[in-house]
Each structure stands twice: as C-alpha cells, then as structure tokens.
C-alpha cells in the first residue's frame, strides 16, 4: 500500500489518493504521483495475503452497481507512531476496463482529522463543488464521528464523492468532490479498506499504526451488499450482514 496524498496537514498533493490508496494497499504497484496506494489490478493475487506498500484489511463487494453508500464510523483514536506511514479509510471500485478508483479519507496527524481523497485511474485532480473550506486545509472530519459516504461511479461523465459529517470545529455539513472526465463504464466490483500505507515496500517493517473503523449499512444502488473478506494483513476484518469492521494493528 502506498501512501496516499495529503491534504491540509499532510500536504495535499491534489493528486489524491484513489490510486494511492488503492495502489499501495491493494497491489504492489504504485499509481503515478501517489505513493503507497495500489494502482492496477495486475497483482491482486499477491494482495490477497499481503498488501504491498502497507498493511491493512480489504473486503470486496460483489456488485456492478453505480452508486455506493455507507456510514463510516471513524476511529476515536489513531496511533500512528512512525514517520513513514499514513492511515487511510476508503472505498472505491474496479472497472472492467481496468481502471481502479480509491475514494475516501486520509488521516492528518498534524491536525488529528480525516480529510477527503480521490483518485480514479491516472486522474487525481479534484474539483470541489461544495464544502472545501470546511473539510480541507487545517480542517477535516472529527475522530470518533460518523461520516455518510456516497460515491457515484459516473455522473455526467464524472466520478463524484459526497461526505456528510462533523468537522473538528463542530460544523456539520458536507463536502462534494469529483474527478472530471472519468467516463466510467461497467464496474467489476467495489471495495472498502482501512490501511496504513507507505511510499516504498522497504518502509513496511517500520509501520507502527493502530486504529479501527466500520463501514455500516453498505448499499449499492439502494440494495444491501454483504462484504467478502479478501485481505487481513496486520488487520482483523469482521463482517456482519452489510456491515464490516476493519481493525489495523502493527
């Protein structure tokens, strides 16, 4: 797993993380511009036992639907006692075309908040439609809070994420971001992950991260979907109905 980009406190490369998260976490290959996140699906078999460029847990959602929703319960506390890894909590999908999307949240140790992140294939330049000033820079979603996530694979040719929750100032509202011009067609499967990602595989042994999160009431196209456990790499993944808890500990 690679280390996705950073926003606000962690330097936001706007090259956000879809690929980063996905790249580092799921596969051994890094996406362009985003350290630590998986990029393509070529090394899926390897990822099933270990997440290259990081550690964590992953589940797949066997649905080809277009709209993903879930309530994410953020960790009350995050122990990230190293200088090389970044915690991520995210969802996303793999298209039949091979495009991998990583969409969710990245932890800022500097501000103790969770910030939005997106990457779809080679595209990682986000467009903010609403809420940028409330959930980026030195602001983000408050630890221990619940965030309502909605992902649209293709909305007028763009991939969009909406996150609704409470920031570190106590403001409750939403942020809407999208990657434009993705033109996603058929989906192969969806996914959810919690990872601690690094930029290089050689940094894996130095990771010291402990946190736990849940994706509750997971639906795709308004239908409940039961997660299928794929990877537990220094992580415990527990599924109950259309809910999953991922606890990372190293």
UniProtKB/Swiss-Prot annotation:
Localization annotation: Secreted
Q: Does the keyword Signal apply?
A: yes
Family of the protein in this entry: To B.subtilis YrpD.
Main location (coarse class): secreted
Q: Which InterPro entries match?
A: YrpD, YrpD-like_sf
> Which is a Gene Ontology cellular component entry for this protein?
extracellular region
- UniProt signal peptide: 1-47
Query: Which keywords fit this entry according to its UniProt record?
Result: Secreted, Signal
> Keyword Amino-acid biosynthesis on this protein?
no
Identify this protein by name.
Answer: Uncharacterized protein YncM
Report the Pfam families cross-referenced here. YrpD
